[in-house]
Every structure is written in C-alpha cells, then in structure tokens.
Swiss-Prot record:
GO biological process: protein export from nucleus
Name of the protein in question: Brefeldin A resistance protein
Molecular functions (GO terms): small GTPase binding
UniProt-annotated stretches for the region Disordered: 1-173, 191-269
Domain (RanBD1) ranges: 256-396
The species this protein was found in: Schizosaccharomyces pombe (strain 972 / ATCC 24843) (Fission yeast)
Cross-referenced PANTHER family: RAN BINDING PROTEIN, RAN-BINDING PROTEIN 3B-RELATED
C-alpha cells in the first residue's frame, strides 16, 4: 500500500508540473493575442443563429476550438471527444483537482444572451481555466492521490443501476418442480374412499337420532317410576326418624351429668392440715455449704412458724417453700431444749442493718447453719420471738 501511495504521489506531482508549464504557455499566448486584435476577432467572433439545432452548435464550437489551437500552436489539455461534446451541451468543463489530476467537472460556459441581436456568444471555458493558476496542494491531504479520476475503480460506472435479483441455489427445487409435492387429490383413490365414508356417516347419523329419541323416552319413564318409589320410602323413613331423637336426648343428658361429676375439686394433702401458722414473713434463705464453708442461696418465699393445733400433742417447725414451684427449701423441727443462742440476729456487714436471723439446727445428725434475710430489723426481731414461743416447754432458757 505504501509503495502504491508513493507512486500515486509522484504521478500527481509530475502532472501538476506539466499543467503549470502549459498554463504559463497559454498566459503568454493570451498576452500576445491582446496586442493582435485580428487574432482575437477570429477566435471569439463565431456566432450561431437560434434556428440551428443544438448538435450543429456543438460541432461548430468544436471545429472553431480546434482551428484556434492549431493556429496558435497550443496543444489542448484534454482531447475533444464525443464525451466532451456532451459535456459542453450540459455546461460541464474539465478542471484541476487538489491531487494534481484532471477531473471532469462542469464546463463554465458563459452564455451572454443579447436580447436585441437574439444570438448566443459562446466562449469556451478552456481559455479562462488555462489563465487561472493551479490550485495549491494541501500538505496535510495524504490521501489526495486517491481521487475519483486516478482511482483504479474510476472505470466502474457509478450510475444508478437496479440490483439484479440473485437466483437462489435452490431454484431448481421449487415447489412446482419438487419431487415432494403432493399430487392433487382430485384423481387420487383417497377421494373415492372419503366420499363413500361421508355417505355412510350421513345414513348412520339418521339412525343414531332415532335411537336417541327412544332412549330418552325410556329414561323419562324410568325417572317417573323411581321418583314415586323414592317419595314413598322417604315418608316411611321420616316416621321412623322422629322417634329416634327422643332416645338420643336421653343419652345426651346422662353424659352431661357424668362429666359434671368428673370436674369435681380434689383436695391436695400438704402435711399442714393439723397445724396452724402463728407467724409468716417473706424472706430469702441462705445456707452454709459443707465443702467451701460459704453462704449459698436456696431461694425465696414465705417462711412460716407452724405449731400443732392441739398443744402438747407434738412439736412445732419452720417451713418455707419456693415461690416458683412451691418446692420445700426449709423444714426445720423445733425440738425441746433449744437455747436462745441458736437464734441470733446479725447484719451482713459492719454498720449495716441487722436484718438477718441466723438459725443453728441439726438435720439428719448433722449441724446446719441457716441465715434468713428479711426486710428490716423489726421483722427479724418478731421472727425470733415467735420461734422462741414455738419451742416446746421444758427446754433450757440460756441467755
């Protein structure tokens, strides 16, 4: 591609130089003609009458142009052919392109119509174009050499031509000529068979209609008979069903009575039925663990001081249940011989409120230390006094 571009550039430069030389020669000749009025008259004073046809005018102009060029010794830049004649008639002229090559453009023909004389003075644009300087080539147009005139595709006609319809490769296999096209059904044996079946279906449809009528009549008779029998059966069954609800009502009353007996309250035995509580208070219970000797919380609930209803029949006890599940968390008997030292009021820390009651008891042959925390000191003293009252008499009263 680069070599082709360079060749085209060289050709354009050479053609440009040749055209510049020719234009300079024509300038010199025109300057000479200005000094010779006889030559100017012979070159330009050709007049053509209006009655002549257009073809004669074109031929006359071409002849005059050739004579003037021969007399002056100037070679025409473009050979006059039949195409140039047509261009003159269509007011076209050749001009110089930016790439330095000759393109076919419109010939500028100055037609000055003189209304008084009624003729047309034709001056070829060849002389004017020769006098004009050549157009300068732009240094930035690198693709100027690829003009329409110098293009290898310039010979190809760009005239609007209707695109030819491409014949399909499957044209031979058209539906009319295809081996797979079905033959007409007119002459086929299938048509006769179809016609015969149609006649049979028509005759068969008539028989089916008659059978349908008979079956419908039979169905109506059966329906009437069955409906009468069913009505009689319903009457008999209705009389029997009237007596059944009475028996059902009796059974339902018995069942309701039995359910009432099942929902009766049941008594829960707690072991406190023969006891009465002389004092109760809400408290939180702590116990000393055997292994680590630290206080451990057992839970909170209501602490009761219970004594037997019949005094002297038994001993009292301290009973406490957990609020959540009512599990017994303290059940300490008050035996005879308990001293006051086993019940001591204390505080959790020095300077704090004395709202704890420490109780030292024996359970299952082991000594256990409890601590009951109440709201304030007054409740702790009341609890201690009631516990001392519940201890059976005959015990030691040590201070």
């Amino acid at each position: 591609m680069t070599s082709k571009m360079e060749n085209n550039k060289d050709e354009s430069i050479s053609t440009k130089n040749a055209l510049e030389e020719k234009s300079n020669e024509t300038k010199d000749e025109t300057s000479k003609r200005k000094h010779d009025p006889a030559e100017e008259e012979s070159a330009v004073s050709t007049k053509v009458s209006k009655s002549e046809p257009l073809e004669d005018k074109g031929n006359a102009e071409v002849k005059e142009f050739k004579e003037t060029t021969k007399s002056n010794g100037v070679k025409p830049e473009v050979e006059i052919t039949e195409s140039t004649k047509i261009q003159k008639e269509s007011n076209t002229e050749p001009c110089i392109s930016t790439g330095g090559k000759v393109e076919e453009k419109e010939l500028k023909v100055n037609k000055d119509v003189d209304e008084n004389e009624g003729h047309v003075a034709v001056e070829t644009g060849k002389k004017e174009s020769a006098a004009k300087p050549a157009a300068s080539v732009s240094p930035f147009s690198q693709f100027a050499s690829f003009s329409n005139a110098s293009s290898p595709f310039s010979n190809v006609s760009t005239a609007s031509s209707e695109p030819k319809e491409e014949k399909s490769a499957f044209g031979a296999f058209a539906s009319s000529k295809s081996a797979f096209t079905m033959k007409s059904v007119k002459d086929s044996p299938f048509k006769k068979f179809a016609a015969g079946t149609a006649v049979e279906t028509e005759s068969g449809s008539g028989k089916e209609k008659e059978n349908d009528k008979k079956s419908s009549e039979n169905f109506d008779e059966l329906l009437a008979n069955t409906s009468a029998k069913a009505f009689e059966n319903q009457k008999g069954s209705a009389g029997e069903t009237k007596s059944e609800p009475k028996e059902a009502d009796k059974g339902s009353g018995d069942s309701t009575k039995s359910t009432m007996h099942q929902l009766s309250d049941s008594e829960i035995i707690t072991g406190e039925e023969e006891e009465e509580s002389i004092f109760s208070v809400r408290a939180r219970l702590y116990v000393v663990a055997d292994e680590k000797k630290t206080w451990k919380e057992r839970g909170q609930g209501i602490l009761k001081v219970n004594v037997p209803k019949q005094r002297g029949s038994g001993s009292g006890r301290l009973l406490m249940r957990n609020d959540a599940v009512h599990r017994v968390i303290m059940n300490v008997p008050l035996f005879q011989g308990m001293s006051k030292k086993s019940l001591q009021i204390a505080s959790a820390s020095s300077g704090g409120s004395a709202n704890y009651l420490k109780i030292f008891v024996i359970e299952n042959g082991k000594s256990v230390l409890y601590a009951v925390r109440v709201k304030d000191n007054s409740l702790a003293e009341q609890l201690r006094n009631h516990v001392l009252e519940a201890i059976p008499k005959g015990g030691r009263e040590d201070a």
